[in-house]
Amino acid sequence: MFLTSPFESCIVLSSLIAGLLFSLSTGFVGILGVFASLFETELSVSPKRLSLSSLSWPKTFWALLSSVEGVSWESSLFACIVGCCFAVTVIASLSASRVFGTVASSFRDSSCCCDSSPAVSVLATPATAALALLSLLLSLPCWSTSTEAFTVDPSPSVFSMLANRITIGL
């Protein structure tokens, strides 16, 4: 409806898909390692840290996160880095889609009076908001909880082996 030429819609949609695939490939290994580390260690919830005053959102979320023990500190730090990389790649790729939409509008037929920038905004703004919110939610547990809430697991985890292989590969 908003995209008047097939060339323009193809460029905008392909740039959005490419940005999504790039951001997912950036965070996929890190998220896998974090979940492997979380499920490999025993998780114990301490009811003493939960109080009746922390029943409102987002206090309940913070209290539940701070009551979880057995999560290694390196997995939380890596999840924070993955969340930041995810947000940066998504925002950069969707900004590139706006540039591609502007370039596509210059190649369009001059007889059409419609501008393509509203169409690109209609497609890019909800996708930017949704993916940036997803990346922020992925990295919130690492930013919100203190390092005292995490206990270091001395046994080598799947995350540690993944991190060592990535470091050796680099």
From Swiss-Prot:
Could you tell me what this protein is called?
A: Putative uncharacterized membrane protein YJL175W
Annotated transmembrane regions = 16-36, 77-97, 120-140
Please tell me what else the database record remarks about this protein.
Partially overlaps SWI3.
The parts of the chain that form a coiled coil are none
| Native source organism of the sequence | Saccharomyces cerevisiae (strain ATCC 204508 / S288c)
Q: How does it sit in the membrane?
A: Multi-pass membrane protein
Residue ranges, Extracellular side: 37-76, 141-170
In its keyword annotation, does this UniProt entry include Transmembrane helix? yes
Subcellular location, in the record's words?
A: Membrane
What's in the GO CC field? Answer: membrane
Question: Chief subcellular site?
Answer: membrane
Q: Which UniProt keywords apply?
A: Membrane, Transmembrane, Transmembrane helix
Task: Kindly report every residue range on the membrane side named Cytoplasmic.
Answer: 1-15, 98-119
